[in-house]
């Protein structure tokens, strides 16, 4: 087989032939990879010693695109990349040296989305019958953003034609389920060590000014499922720190937290989950898919943020005690 680099160049050429005028090949090469397989599909990186009960997750920053997926798509790579939380994994990478485990996906969100239920599937996009247990009626499915997405960006259809149910189930078995098994193990490992754990699920959002005249968004959005996925001190600590950095912060609007926040957060057992949505204008050029000059500043502020969370007294995070105690 040809090297990954030559294979990727061949795919770019093929895709540009199919979509003349595409800017598929006009992005810096180090920003995205095209491979025939994921090696590895995701990473869980742990420090030599944890300095607190806090870990970070970046499920939507993957930018390794399977060649067969690109050829099956009717969209160019730049359009597909609009669904990426670009460089969020790089923003949190330095936290490992500060004593915090991180997890990051390498596969793209538009290929399989781990921030969904395992079988949120849209019957309109598949050839064949879906399993009876598939959730075909969720709001996310209705919007084309199920476990295997039908659309990206402004409701742009990803595929030229229907894909097989078997292909969707393959992605779920090979990527979705192993990702969650690994994330759960990492979360529970921290919980066993400290008696509690805080999972910060990191995402990014368009600034609202990249493609059209939209109202500017907050700098950061804290999502705690309206106070159900973590104890109040977690969200309060995040908000206080972020406002101290000078950022405009909102809570649960417009993002209250997705499947990961809801599924992993269980404060009654000492498991706390919170979603952190970062405005892309804070750290990148959204049109060119490049880091901006403020990237390092934000990465440093996230290190301070992690330290503040780690300073929360464990007694405030551990499982609720009976009133008699």
Language-model-derived ranges and their functions:
Residues 1-2:
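Intrinsic disorder/low-complexity segments
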Residues 11-12:
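Compositionally biased, intrinsically disordered low-complexity segments enriched in Pro/Arg/Gln/His
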Residues 27-199, 204-325:
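N-terminal catalytic or cofactor-binding beta/alpha core of small enzyme domains
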């Amino acid at each position: 087989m040809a090297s990954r680099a030559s294979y990727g160049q061949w795919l770019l050429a093929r895709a540009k032939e199919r979509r003349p005028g595409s800017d598929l090949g006009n992005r810096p090469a180090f920003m995205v990879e095209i491979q025939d397989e994921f090696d590895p599909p995701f990473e869980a990186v742990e420090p030599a010693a944890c300095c607190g009960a806090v870990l970070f997750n970046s499920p939507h920053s993957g930018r390794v695109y399977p060649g067969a997926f690109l050829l099956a798509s009717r969209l160019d790579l730049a359009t597909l990349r609009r669904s990426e939380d670009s460089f969020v994994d790089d923003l949190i990478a330095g936290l490992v040296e500060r004593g915090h485990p991180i997890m990051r996906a390498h596969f793209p969100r538009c290929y399989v989305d781990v921030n969904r239920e395992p079988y949120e599937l849209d019957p309109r996009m598949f050839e064949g019958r879906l399993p009876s247990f598939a959730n075909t009626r969720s709001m996310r499915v209705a919007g084309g953003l199920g476990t295997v997405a039908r659309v990206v960006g402004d409701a742009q259809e990803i595929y030229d034609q229907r894909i097989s149910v078997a292909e969707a189930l393959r992605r779920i078995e090979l990527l979705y389920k192993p990702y969650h098994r690994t994330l759960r193990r990492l979360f529970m490992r921290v919980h066993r060590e400290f008696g509690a754990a805080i999972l910060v699920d990191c995402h990014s959002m368009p600034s609202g000014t990249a493609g059209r005249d939209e109202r500017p968004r907050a700098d950061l959005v804290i999502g705690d499922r309206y106070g159900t996925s973590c104890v109040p001190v977690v969200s309060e600590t995040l908000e206080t720190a972020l406002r101290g950095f000078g950022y405009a912060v909102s809570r649960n609007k417009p993002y209250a937290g997705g499947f990961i926040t809801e599924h992993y957060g269980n404060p009654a057992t000492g498991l706390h989950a919170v979603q952190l949505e970062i405005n892309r204008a804070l750290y990148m050029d959204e049109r060119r898919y490049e880091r901006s000059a403020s990237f390092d500043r934000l990465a440093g502020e996230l290190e301070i943020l992690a330290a503040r969370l780690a300073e929360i007294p464990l007694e405030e995070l551990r499982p609720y005690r009976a009133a008699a105690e």
